UniProtKB/Swiss-Prot annotation:
<comment type="function">
    <text>Transcriptional corepressor. May specifically inhibit gene expression when recruited to promoter regions by sequence-specific DNA-binding proteins such as BCL6 and MLLT3. This repression may be mediated at least in part by histone deacetylase activities which can associate with this corepressor. Involved in the repression of TFAP2A; impairs binding of BCL6 and KDM2B to TFAP2A promoter regions.</text>
</comment>
<keyword id="KW-0156">Chromatin regulator</keyword>
<dbReference type="GO" id="GO:0140297">
    <property type="term" value="F:DNA-binding transcription factor binding"/>
</dbReference>
<feature type="region of interest" description="Disordered">
    <location>
        <begin position="1071"/>
        <end position="1187"/>
    </location>
</feature>
<feature type="compositionally biased region" description="Basic and acidic residues">
    <location>
        <begin position="1253"/>
        <end position="1279"/>
    </location>
</feature>
<keyword id="KW-0539">Nucleus</keyword>
<feature type="compositionally biased region" description="Basic and acidic residues">
    <location>
        <begin position="1166"/>
        <end position="1175"/>
    </location>
</feature>
<feature type="compositionally biased region" description="Low complexity">
    <location>
        <begin position="605"/>
        <end position="620"/>
    </location>
</feature>
<dbReference type="GO" id="GO:0060021">
    <property type="term" value="P:roof of mouth development"/>
</dbReference>
<feature type="compositionally biased region" description="Polar residues">
    <location>
        <begin position="580"/>
        <end position="594"/>
    </location>
</feature>
<feature type="repeat" description="ANK 2">
    <location>
        <begin position="1496"/>
        <end position="1525"/>
    </location>
</feature>
<dbReference type="GO" id="GO:0005634">
    <property type="term" value="C:nucleus"/>
</dbReference>
<feature type="repeat" description="ANK 3">
    <location>
        <begin position="1529"/>
        <end position="1558"/>
    </location>
</feature>
<dbReference type="InterPro" id="IPR047144">
    <property type="entry name" value="BCOR-like"/>
</dbReference>
<keyword id="KW-0007">Acetylation</keyword>
<feature type="region of interest" description="Disordered">
    <location>
        <begin position="1430"/>
        <end position="1451"/>
    </location>
</feature>
<feature type="modified residue" description="Phosphoserine">
    <location>
        <position position="423"/>
    </location>
</feature>
Length: 1755
């Protein structure tokens, strides 16, 4: 109580006594919603409200509402700029955020065709739990999805509902029209054709949530309805929060395939349609993806009769469904010459391309010249070669069409998966059913769909998106389709949403990969490449290696390998597929590596990662890869002979029971979902449970090894809602993770080896060159495919890569192929490496673009999504922003073809502008090529050794890859998807397993299991699986060149081999390194570019890179965190990524600044990590901090997820070692620099989206000061300005104010709060003092253990110092800080000091401020750390941000001493002391709650009113201050104002509704408080006015000051006639009479006139009694009526007449009323008093004008 007295010392005694008396009574202080709560709310909103499109009826549900939901959530974003060529929309961009969407998607899937459409004879009832879960989650029954029932093939065909029947959103359908599908309702995927017929790939919904169209597309792709396939194999277990497609065991799968239901399953694309429609763009009539059911997807025939045909008859529907995939449709459709004009793929591609596709996918890296469509075709033929050739799509066009449907399907699957955690598998299942036409598709729709869809898609976009093809043939999306799909192969709707990581789960919806290929074939290579460019980045972003993006970026290749290499990791294939699509399409020759990866798992590793990446996406090869790996079954050809029943090998449903349609037994390679992680094709598609044929078997191990697939799932789940994916992830993770992880790790090693391999590098260079040229043409497509950049984020684009690392553990397989060599660090070993090496050159710019687009997306999504979510909204947004940035800039194409363009960037070294994309293909490919590649390629290699050797950067890349993969598996997977819920989900469920395994192995020694043991165990298991998979080397063999590069070495390094800092760091650290490596890559790329910054593009790329990465990392993580405890894990992983990369980057002077910023971004992204990292930073070396941060992030994520790896101690140790290594390598003041960088980066974690500032953390502190508003600036101008694209991505991330803020907050509460206990706060304070990133990291590590605790007291600062300075940090900033674990304090000069504080700042409104505040600091620091050139660039980038930056902190703010003990805030202090600027600063930046009350219950308004600060009172009221806020003693602000005699304030308060009648609890009223006569009189009059006066009150009488009668003439008087009362403004017609007086003259008495209302329709008028008129006229009534028929006569009751007349003020003759009886019921006749009657009565009327009166002086 006493402590509060000083606060009120200056107030009157009454205030002192009462306040002091009440001071300690009870803390009435209002605590803002925790960030975690907010994020949760947002996430929940996202999950629950998937944007309408998720909500569909049972049959409609089959259109993959989940995908729609994903799409919807990001619809705005998609429309904003993610629409790529041909109106392709990245479904990932679509809101994958709501659980409802997921639910809907799941339901849709269930209703769609998980019935025995394929196998009418087979009655399959999805597991009841799954069905129930779907219903429960979705809130709606699985809709015919509950059970597969025998249905005659014919019925099933007819059963396939049209888009409308399926409940396709008409909007989705409409969207298709933009695709120009020529009315084709379905997409026919040539490769899907045979498969569809045999395996019914058409019913294979790759991504339930991501792409409703993808399933439909696949179905549509099937020319004929696939054999009736029991579709209910996979029903969404959790329709809402977590959509899990139930993938029945292989025994179910078989029936699935046999069904001849090729009827295209149409998925209506509610909102997802924009994303999913890209796949849909296939004009094929049978476009099952439209329905959300791929051709191979079993669909209820009754539900999708239109799809049933798999023919064009349903084209309109499909088209409608495809609407969301406008551009994509074109891409997909071209391959199939079906009626749908979109099927541009030559007929030859169907068979020719199919074989070629297979071939290319098998050896895409080897045959760079292979056209995407061809490679996809090859894949198709590889899988469904027989199917395609002898399937329903024997002709290339059909194959093309089939391929197109697959992309749609894939998209849909990806989207739906993303939406549904588990729905994608469902959709895939459904799609499979549809595709069964040509090949019996196993009920595991994924596998089947992959077969048929993939074949077609391969034909269409041979190397394009085969990444998903493995898990789902549909993976092979054409480039444009991928962009539309966002991640065509991985989950057609996932390209944009890394969150679609969900598909990394066992579900085998990787099939979507072929989709891009499909369109590309038919359409044009350039278009496809365009799509691929965008798709590839996203593909890359997907865990899958960039299948399609191999050419453009090694990342793609690597990703491809990853997807092929590991079943689940093959999921990255989808991403790679998207990449690959673009790459293959634009430079088939370059892309072949990607395809090759899938096609030839073992060879691919040696081949460029791109091939592997493409391969992952490639339907045929990736399938075994990820299938086998995920299933643990040997990968077998996904495409079976047409006559061969497609039965996925026994799939351990336990694994995929929740997450994916594909059974766990089926190795579901991570498909490249939108932009995040790979999508896992449904195991159903392959007899062996693999999506790709046996020849791909070698590959699956590697791709599957990539944990990126898992993280992808996690990301998707993030988008969908953490809850949704968790179940899926958890069950899925055990097997899938193990398979995925191990192969991934192995892939990583391979990737690394490959990258390190000069030959590989050369090949990469070649591919990149080819890709570069092709991709450059693809740039336009990329621009169109803005969604794809999201998809590209992690994979194709540098930023994307980083993001991919974060988002795309699954995507890593894609990266692993070629470009993903650098990517493995992000996605997985292989993926990270493949993606990262190319990243340095191309990716810095590209990723910056993508980051910018992602950021912009994030911003848009934050606005739209957030809050969801928003997840929407978040990951998507980030990716989108990145893409948008790329689009805006010349480099748009670059991001789009990041896999390809990135090499160009890297080629020239650092400062390659986007325009230079072509120039740097080689460096990109090589990964350690030029200086730019030095930094970036280092990442590309991602091998610690290579990284170190190159730039110290390469050191990071490897750990970065693993870290990325781990991060992906742990939640890093979806940068964008992270925003969604997939990443978090993956983190906690699927990812948590990987992380659990990895961390248990690598971090077990020091692991701190702070969170629930279950989560810890899961995370560690996940880690272990990732680890083992990467080290496995089995299927990852192909990826191994890239993947194994990082895998064995990096994996162990990540695991705990701390020999090599990047790799020596524990798995966690490695992950962090990988994450950071991505960032570092950005950083390095930026730095290298900085010298070349002459073009702002380069700076922009850097910024974009950061932004995209950060947004991906942060928004997804935040959303994830808010959605689930796992969310923090994701965030942490991301951070760690940054951290690890940062360390590597530190090796290079330029690298360090960017890296730290990236790290900061990451940290901010996961505030959870921040505390932990902060703690670590203190004790750890600064250089080590990045790795440590990454590991810490991972740990924090794990902790949040329930797995708490060794925290501080381990991280510190790693950091120290890393510092030693890095400081030696960097030659910079490594440690201090790192600290500064880390500190700067941490504050910038959120603001990092801003320019290179984050990249240049050197001036974090100084910059924070001046650039507190960076976040806002970057949020606002970043999107628009190329210089700020990165920031734009970052601000959303950093401030999360618009998109990321909400998501971040949501995720943050669960992470950061728990990790910010007093100890952590103290550490934060230390960090604040030292500005040491290491300290921050250390704190983060500690925070990880305190995350939960911190979550609870997010608003309470733990340390005194923190409390002391807390008031200096905007609430939002604080909120963001907890996310990053930093406490940002703005100096008087506007500088934001980064202070680590465990306490989470006020959660809700402070978030926006936080980013703003935080940003400036990182910028400053970056300037300090970065070279002069970079520094110059920084300002360039930051100036736009500054434009948007919020009010800078006034100098007084730092001088004000806030009495925290009394519960006082800076706002209250400033209000008391009259610091208006500080008050405005606090209000505008939401630093304090305007209604925050201190311990005595007094708020800022009390203080200002008591002291008479009128302006401050006005500001407070304008910002929503409670005018009647009551202190604990009942004192209101009005009481304070009256007591202190502030009359104007009293007036103001009363005008705002202050209640003057309220008294204090002691009974004092305002009238008793007055001290002046003036105040008393005013209050008396006011109260009298309120209650009125008594009649006898003399004082109440009115005083009239004059009368024309009483006043002398000479005095001013009022002349009534001079200005008679009356309406002054009348119509022109009445103007003449306005001032006229009318006089009636008569020789006889005038008849009485009555003003009466006779009709309700008319007002009162003047009436005469008819009796009076007749008496005067002396005539009868009849004669009067006859003579004057025009005179109106009315009848009224006498009683009514009397009532009205007696009450009339105009009637004064009481005598006249004596004749009337007030109770009489007789009627009276009235005649209206008119001029005619007047004349009749002999009266004359004259008008007197006032002017005449004046002149004539009548008066």
């Amino acid at each position: 109580m006493l402590s509060a007295t000083p606060l009120y010392g200056n107030v009157h005694s009454w205030m002192n006594s009462e306040r002091v008396r009440m001071c300690g009574a009870s803390e009435d202080r209002k605590i803002l919603v925790n960030d975690g709560d907010a994020s949760k709310a947002r996430l929940e909103l996202r999950e629950e409200n998937p944007l309408n499109h998720n909500v569909v009826d049972a049959s409609t549900a089959h259109r993959i509402d989940g995908l729609a939901a994903l799409s919807m959530d990001r619809t705005g974003l998609i429309r904003e700029g993610l629409r790529v060529p041909g109106n392709i929309v990245y479904s990932s961009l679509c809101g994958l955020g709501s659980e409802k969407g997921r639910e809907a998607a799941t339901s849709t899937l269930g209703g769609l065709g998980f019935s025995s459409e394929r196998n009418p004879e087979m009655q399959f009832k999805p597991n009841t739990p799954e069905t129930v879960e779907a219903s429960a989650v979705s809130g709606k029954p699985p809709n015919g999805f509950s059970a597969i029932y025998k249905t005659p093939p014919g019925i099933q065909k007819s059963a396939v509902a049209t888009a409308e029947a399926l409940g396709l959103d008409r909007p989705a359908s409409d969207k298709q029209s933009p695709l120009n599908i020529n009315g084709a309702s379905y997409l026919r995927l040539p490769w899907v054709n045979p498969y569809m017929e045999g395996a019914t790939p058409a019913i294979y919904p790759f991504l339930d949530s991501p792409n409703k169209y993808s399933l439909n597309m696949y179905k549509a792709l099937l020319p004929q309805q696939s054999y009736s396939l029991a579709q209910p194999l996979y029903s969404p277990v959790c329709t809402n929060g977590e959509r899990f497609l139930y993938l029945p065991p292989p025994h179910y799968v078989g029936p699935h395939i046999p069904s001849s239901l090729a009827s295209p399953m149409r998925l209506s694309t509610p909102s997802a349609s924009p994303a999913i429609p890209p796949l849909v763009h296939c004009a094929d009539k049978s476009l099952p993806w439209k329905m959300g059911v791929s051709p191979g997807n079993p669909v209820d025939s009754h539900a999708y009769p239109h799809i049933q045909n798999s023919k064009q008859p349903r084209v309109p529907s499909a088209k409608a469904v495809t609407s969301g995939l406008p551009g994509d449709t074109a891409l997909l459709l071209p391959p199939s010459p079906r009626p749908s004009p979109r099927v541009h793929l030559p007929t030859q591609p169907a068979a020719d391309t199919y074989s070629e596709f297979h071939k290319h996918y098998a050896r895409i890296s080897t045959s760079p010249s292979v056209a995407l469509s061809k490679p996809y075709m090859t894949v198709s033929s590889e899988f469904p070669a027989a199917r395609l050739s002898n399937g329903k799509y024997p002709k290339a066009p059909e194959g093309g069409e089939g391929a197109q449907p697959v992309p749609g399907h894939a998209r849909k699957t990806a989207v739906q998966d993303r939406k549904d955690g588990s729905s994608p598998p469902l959709l895939e299942k459904q799609t499979v059913t549809k595709d069964v036409t040509d090949k019996p598709l196993d009920l595991s729709s994924k596998v089947v769909d992959v077969d048929a869809s993939k074949a077609d898609h391969m034909k269409k976009m041979a190397p394009t998106v085969l990444v998903h093809s493995r898990a789902g043939s549909g993976l092979v999306l054409s480039g444009s389709e991928i962009p539309k799909e966002t991640l065509s192969p991985p989950g057609n709707g996932c390209a944009i949403y890394r969150s679609e990581i969900i598909s990394t789960a066992p579900s085998s919806w990787v099939v979507p990969g072929p989709s891009p290929n499909e369109e590309n074939n038919g359409k044009s290579m350039s278009l496809k490449n365009k799509a691929l460019d965008w798709a590839i980045p996203q593909q890359r972003s997907s865990s899958c290696p960039r299948m399609g993006g191999t050419d453009a970026v090694i990342t793609n290749v690597s990703g491809s390998v990853s997807s092929a290499g590991r079943p689940a990791s093959a999921s990255p294939a989808p991403n790679a597929n998207a990449d690959g699509t673009k790459t293959s399409r634009s430079s088939v020759e370059t892309t072949p590596s990607v395809i090759q990866h899938v096609g030839q798992p073992p060879a691919t590793p040696a081949k460029h990662s791109s091939s592997t990446s493409s391969k992952g996406a490639k339907a045929s090869n990736p399938e075994p890869s990820f299938k086998a790996n995920e299933n643990g079954l040997p990968p077998s050809s996904i495409f079976l002979s047409p006559n061969e029943a497609f039965r996925s090998p026994p799939i351990p449903y336990p694994r995929s029971y929740l997450p994916y349609p594909a059974p766990e037994g089926i190795a579901v390679s991570p498909l490249s979902l939108h932009g995040k992680g790979p999508v896992y094709p449904h195991p159903v598609l392959l007899p062996n449970g693999s999506l790709f044929p046996g020849h791909l078997a070698p590959k699956p191990g590697l791709p599957y090894g990539l944990p990126t697939g898992r993280p992808e799932f996690v990301t998707y789940q993030d988008a969908l809602g953490l809850g949704m994916v968790h179940p899926m992830l958890i069950p899925h993770t055990p097997i899938e993770i193990t398979k995925e992880e191990k192969p991934e790790r192995r892939s990583r090693s391979h990737e690394r080896a490959r990258y390190e391999d000069p030959t590989l590098r050369n090949r990469f260079s070649e591919i990149l060159e080819t890709s570069s040229t092709k991709l450059h043409p693809d740039v336009p497509t990329d621009k169109n495919l803005k969604p794809n950049p999201n998809w590209n984020q992690g994979k194709t684009v540098v930023k994307s890569d980083k993001l991919v690392y974060v988002d795309l553990l699954r995507e890593e397989p894609d990266a692993k192929t070629d470009t993903n060599v650098s990517k493995p660090s992000f996605a997985a070993e292989s993926v990270g490496q493949s993606a990262e090496p190319p990243k340095p050159s191309v990716e810095p710019a590209l990723q910056q673009h993508r980051d910018f687009i992602a950021l912009r997306e994030e911003l848009g999504r934050i606005s739209d999504f957030h809050e969801t979510y928003t997840f929407k909204q978040p990951v998507f947004t980030v990716s989108k922003d990145s893409v948008l940035a790329g689009t805006n800039k010349e480099n748009l194409g670059l991001p789009v073809s990041t896999p390809f363009l990135e090499p160009p960037l890297g080629s020239d070294g650092p400062a390659v502008t986007f325009g230079k994309t072509q120039e740097d293909p080689k460096p990109f490919c090589v990964g350690s090529a030029p200086p730019s590649v030095d930094v970036t390629p280092t990442y590309t290699k991602d091998g610690a050794d290579e990284a170190e050797s190159n730039d110290g950067k390469v050191l990071k890349p490897k750990p970065s890859k693993l870290a990325k993969r781990i991060a992906n598996s742990a939640g890093y997977v979806g940068d964008r998807f992270k925003c969604v819920t997939t990443e978090l989900y993956a983190d906690s469920s699927q990812l948590s397993r990987e992380q659990r395994a990895l961390q248990m192995e690598g971090l077990q020694e020091d692991s701190i299991l702070c969170l629930p043991a279950a989560y810890c165990e899961r995370a560690m298991m996940r880690f272990s699986e990732l680890e083992m998979k990467e080290r496995e080397g089995g299927h990852p063999a192909t990826k191994d060149s890239e993947m194994c590069k990082f895998s064995p070495a990096d994996w162990e390094r990540l695991k705990g081999n701390q020999d090599k800092k990047p790799k020596s760091v524990t798995l966690e650290e490695a992950i962090a390194e990988q994450n950071e490596s991505e960032r570092c890559e950005y950083s390095v790329g930026n730095k290298h570019r900085d010298p070349f910054e002459a073009p702002e593009d380069k700076d922009l790329p850097v910024e974009k890179y950061f932004v995209e990465r950060q947004p991906v990392s942060e928004p997804p993580a935040d959303q994830v965190a808010s959605d689930m405890p796992h969310s923090p894990t994701l965030r942490v992983d991301r951070k760690r990524k940054v951290s690890g990369d940062s360390s590597h980057t530190e090796t290079t002077a330029e690298e360090v600044p960017e890296d730290p910023l990236l790290k900061a971004k990451r940290r901010r992204v996961s505030k959870d990590d921040w505390p932990e990292r902060e703690m670590t930073n203190s004790s750890s070396n600064h250089l080590e901090d990045p790795h440590y941060s990454e590991l810490t992030n991972l740990k924090v994520c794990i902790e949040l997820t329930g797995l708490h790896p060794k925290k501080q101690r381990h991280l510190l140790h790693l950091r120290e070692r890393w510092e030693q290594q890095v400081s030696a390598a960097d030659g910079k003041p490594g440690r201090q620099s790192r600290k500064e960088v880390t500190q700067a980066t941490q504050p910038e974690a959120i603001p990092q989206g801003t320019n290179i500032t984050e990249e240049k953390p050197g001036r974090k502190r100084a910059e924070a000061k001046g650039n507190r508003s960076w976040s806002e600036e970057s949020l606002k101008p970043s999107d628009n300005e190329q210089g700020l694209p990165v920031f734009s991505g970052s601000p959303p991330m950093k401030s999360l104010s618009s998109t990321s803020a909400g998501g971040k907050k949501q995720a943050q509460p669960s992470c950061a709060p728990a990790s910010r206990p007093p100890a952590k706060q103290q550490k934060i304070k230390e960090n604040q003092k030292t500005d040491v990133l290491c300290a921050d990291e250390e704190e983060d590590c500690q925070a990880a253990s305190l995350l939960q605790k911190y979550t609870d007291n997010s608003e309470k600062p733990s340390g005194k110092r923190l409390c002391k300075t807390k008031h200096l940090i905007p609430q939002e900033s604080r909120r963001g800080l907890p996310l990053t674990g930093e406490y940002y304090v703005e100096n008087a000069d506007g500088k934001v000091t980064v202070r680590r504080f465990r306490k989470r700042p006020e959660p809700s409104s402070d978030y926006d401020l936080s980013p703003a505040k935080q940003e400036p600091k990182p910028f400053d620091r970056l300037q300090q750390l970065l070279p002069a050139s970079q520094s110059t660039q920084l300002p360039c980038s930051s100036s736009p941000q500054e434009t948007t930056q919020s009010r800078p902190m006034p100098p007084e703010a730092r001088r004000l001493i806030v009495n925290k003990n009394a519960g006082e805030t800076l706002l209250q202090r400033a209000a008391r002391l009259g610091y208006e600027e500080v008050v405005l600063y606090c209000l505008e930046n939401k630093i304090c709650d305007v209604n925050h009350r201190d311990n005595a219950g007094y708020c800022a308004l009390h203080e200002a009113c008591a002291r008479g600060w009128l302006n401050i009172v006005r500001h407070l009221l304008e910002y929503g201050a409670d005018v009647n806020c009551s202190a604990q003693d009942g004192t209101r602000p009005l009481h304070d104002a009256v007591e202190n005699d502030h009359l104007e304030i009293v007036r103001l308060l009363l005008s705002y509704g202050a209640d003057p009648t309220l008294a204090t609890y002691s009974g004092r009223t305002i009238m008793k408080m007055t001290h002046s006569e003036l105040m008393e009189k005013f209050l008396t009059d006011y109260l009298n006015d309120l209650q009125g006066r008594n009649d006898d009150d003399a004082s109440g009488t009115w005083d009239f000051y004059g009368s024309s009668v009483c006043e002398p003439d000479d005095e001013s008087g009022y002349d009534v006639l001079a200005n008679p009362p009356g309406p002054e403004d009348q119509d022109d017609d009445d103007d003449a009479y306005s001032d006229v007086f009318e006089f009636e003259f008569s020789e006889t008495p005038l008849l009485p006139c009555y003003n009466i209302q006779v009709s309700v329709a008319q007002g009162p008028r003047n009436w005469l009694l008819l009796s009076d008129v007749l008496k005067k006229l002396k005539m009868s009534s009849r004669i009067f009526r006859c003579n004057f028929p025009n005179v109106e006569i009315v009848t009224i009751a006498e009683a009514e007449f009397y009532r009205q007349v007696s009450a009339s003020l105009l009637f004064s003759c009481s005598k006249d009323l004596e004749a009337f009886n007030p109770e009489s019921k007789e009627l009276l006749d009235l005649v209206e008093f008119t001029n005619e009657i007047q004349t009749l009565l002999g009266s004359s009327v004259e008008w007197l004008h006032p002017s005449d009166l004046a002149s004539d002086n009548y008066w």
